[in-house]
From Swiss-Prot:
Pathway: One-carbon metabolism; tetrahydrofolate interconversion; Amino-acid biosynthesis; glycine biosynthesis; glycine from L-serine: step 1/1
Name of this protein: Serine hydroxymethyltransferase
Catalytic activity: (6R)-5,10-methylene-5,6,7,8-tetrahydrofolate + glycine + H2O = (6S)-5,6,7,8-tetrahydrofolate + L-serine
NCBIfam families: PRK00011.1
Sorted UniProt keywords: Amino-acid biosynthesis, Cytoplasm, One-carbon metabolism, Pyridoxal phosphate, Transferase
Origin species: Phytoplasma australiense
HAMAP family: SHMT
Gene for this chain: glyA
PROSITE patterns per UniProt: SHMT
Length: 413
């Protein structure tokens, strides 16, 4: 029996089917992507999308919100339990909007922000000039150490003492090492700054106590996405232990930057928060890290330069210029896509290439670990990637690798 969508809108139906096929037949190594459970998908596609619910549970601007009040309260309580937080806001539509809500709540225009530079692994919303965060606030960047390619806390401290920012941001989009949130708290205390931790990429590890929790280090506020390692729907989350800050955050999210929350997404967040409390989920998170470490070590053995010489989480960067000065992330990502291996180009510390080309690629293990990959699979995958790069001009050889990948993906769950 044909689906209603295929009859009513065959073009969109066909594109969804093509994307389903692409996700099935490709090895996905985008660090910010994952595969949600059937239950999360079912919840997102539910009739909850019909309900408008401006406001917060018990304080809505529309009537008929009893059921969605209960759903949002469940999501809030599960988020609080998962991260051992006193307060949670589950309404942000994205991580970027969660960050925007925090900055709007805690800062005045032209206040100073100190965060990791984008090239070194930071995020656009942490103060980049093209983002709202760089337009409305004075943004300053710290860098990783040029030798170790890791955070240099004493250097960050000196910069903070010089700049005296109102907000310090710890948490990144392309940094492969554990973050010492306690060190950041000490630095923030010295300059009387707020400390915001953006755990969008490492939320799954924090939830399972495999990485330090910034709230335990007295971070003032924590933001996150609910996808990536947390393996929920695409959306944002804000956590804090401070009542006054939570009141400011709630006003900043609504009515500050958002209207009606997406109740079908909030319900899916609740489902994913329950999933994240299971032993199975913790085992998954442990495997994500093991896989990333085996993957990175295999590239190192093959002579590739892995930024910071390894990883403590789900991702790592490869500096392609160390392999061939003519390589760019754009070029290598395109070559790998030809053989159905999907990575993203990425800037590396102190990158001299333009952002649309970059000197590196970023590789992540969450999605394929969800598919069932173990360390041996990532060791094999590193070999295929190496072969594709070395034989990049041999289309016959690339087709051979693509066939091997297609045969392999047929076994995916």
């Amino acid at each position: 029996m044909k689906s209603q969508l295929s009859l009513k809108d065959p073009k969109i139906f066909e594109l969804i089917e093509q994307e389903k096929k692409r996700q099935k037949e490709n090895i996905i190594l985008i660090a910010s992507e994952n595969f949600v459970s059937k239950e999360v998908l079912e919840t997102q596609g539910s009739i909850l999308t019909n309900k408008y619910a401006e406001g917060y549970p018990g304080k809505r601007y529309y009537h008929g919100c009893g059921n969605v009040d209960d759903i949002e309260q469940i999501a809030i309580e599960r988020a609080k339990k998962l991260f051992n937080a006193r307060y949670a806001n589950v309404q942000p539509h994205s991580g970027s909007q969660a960050n925007m809500a925090v900055l709007q709540a805690l800062l005045q225009p032209n206040d100073k922000i100190l965060s990791l530079s984008l090239n070194d692994g930071g995020h656009l919303t942490h103060g980049h000039k093209l983002s709202f965060s760089g337009k409305y606030y004075q943004s300053y960047s710290y860098n990783v150490d040029p030798t170790t390619e890791m955070l240099d806390y004493e250097s960050i401290r000196k910069l903070a003492l010089e700049i005296k920012p109102k907000l310090i941001i710890a948490g990144y989009s392309a940094y492969s090492r554990k973050i010492n949130f306690q060190k950041f708290r000490e630095i923030a205390n010295e300059v009387n700054a707020y400390l915001m931790a953006d755990i969008a990429h490492i939320a799954g590890f924090v939830a399972c106590k495999l990485h330090p929790c910034p709230l335990e280090a007295q971070a003032d506020i924590v933001t996150s996405t609910t996808h990536k390692t947390l393996r929920g729907p695409r959306g944002g989350l804000i956590l804090t232990n401070k009542e006054k800050i939570m009141q400011q955050i709630n006003r900043s999210v609504f009515p500050g930057i958002q209207g009606g929350p997406l109740m079908h997404v909030i319900a899916a967040k609740a489902v994913s928060f329950k999933e994240a409390q299971s032993l199975e989920f913790k085992n998954y998170q442990q495997q994500v890290i093991k896989n990333a470490q085996a993957f990175a070590q295999t590239f190192q053995k093959k002579g590739y330069h892995v930024v910071s010489q390894g990883t403590d989480n789900h991702l790592f960067l490869i500096n392609l210029k160390k392999t061939n000065p003519l390589f760019t992330g754009e070029k290598i990502a395109n070559i790998l896509e030809k053989v159905n291996i999907i990575v993203n180009k990425n800037t590396i510390p102190f990158d001299q290439e333009k952002p649309m080309f970059t000197s590196g690629i970023r590789l992540g293990t969450p999605a394929m670990t969800t598919k069932g990959f173990q360390e041996a699979d990532f060791i094999k995958l590193a070999d295929l990637i190496d072969q594709a790069i070395k034989n990049r001009d041999d289309n016959v050889y690339l087709q051979k690798i693509k066939k091997e990948v297609l045969d392999w993906t047929n076994d995916f769950k």
